[in-house]
Amino acid sequence: MRFGVDEAGKGPVLGSMFAAAVRADPAALPGGVGDSKDIRPERRERLAKEIRESADAVGIAEISVERIDADETDMNTLTVEGQAEALSAVARDGLSGTVDAGDTDAARFGRRVADAVDTDVAVTAEHGADETDSLVGAASIIAKVARDTHVAELAAEYGDVGSGYPSDPTTRTFLADYVDRHGELPACARRSWSTCDDVLAAASQSTLSDF
């Protein structure tokens, strides 16, 4: 029995980031588990259901927009916290496993995650672990499905918000239109992102040009 941990939604300008941990016998996992970004959404959902059924335990942690925008933190620290919170939900003394490294220094990232978990676990951090470790790949799928569900909930509240990523024209249009109508950013926006600064600056310039 081992564990794998990964996160989804680190880079978007909209919504929460999610981390997931899966404790299981790798041999019990369904076939086709890998990096969630390479799997179509419908198949991700089916695999997530099968992973939950075959795993010994699954843990999920949500890192909210409010935590992301807090002055005293950064995304590396929040990724450590999210992975540690998800891992804490499935960890047992003496357990070992792999986490996807969210820092350029993989060893340092692994130490930080291990230090943030109360249970005595052995953590190995690797870059691209979601592509090489089936348990990390399984955690990647669970985290991505949680993030997809979250984005669908935002769309139900606000209308089409796109993927939530700064590079998505639909997301940028949503932000610009929302600010134009309401004079402020939506509550789901990560206000500390430069994308939000750009949208607010463009709205301010547009207002000035009206005079």
Swiss-Prot record:
This protein's record includes keyword Cell wall biogenesis/degradation: no
Gene Ontology cellular component terms for the protein in this record: cytoplasm; ribonuclease H2 complex
Molecular function (Gene Ontology), one example: RNA-DNA hybrid ribonuclease activity
Cofactor: how and how many bound: Manganese or magnesium. Binds 1 divalent metal ion per monomer in the absence of substrate. May bind a second metal ion after substrate binding.
Subcellular localization: Cytoplasm
Segments forming domain RNase H type-2: 1-205
Enzymatic reactions: Endonucleolytic cleavage to 5'-phosphomonoester
InterPro entries per the UniProt record, alphabetical: RNase_H2_suA, RNase_HII/HIII, RNase_HII/HIII_dom, RNase_HII_arc, RNase_HII_hlx-loop-hlx_cap_dom, RNaseH-like_sf, RNaseH_sf
Pfam family, any one: RNase_HII
Residues annotated to bind a divalent metal cation: 6-7, 100
Assigned EC number: 3.1.26.4
Keywords, sorted A to Z: Cytoplasm, Endonuclease, Hydrolase, Manganese, Metal-binding, Nuclease
Superkingdom of the organism of origin: Archaea
Cofactor field: Mn(2+); Mg(2+)
A single GO BP: mismatch repair
PANTHER family in the record: RIBONUCLEASE, RIBONUCLEASE H2 SUBUNIT A
Function field: Endonuclease that specifically degrades the RNA of RNA-DNA hybrids.
Family named by the database record: Belongs to the RNase HII family.
Protein name: Ribonuclease HII
Native species: Haloarcula marismortui (strain ATCC 43049 / DSM 3752 / JCM 8966 / VKM B-1809)
Lineage, broadest ranks: Archaea, Methanobacteriati, Methanobacteriota, Stenosarchaea group, Halobacteria
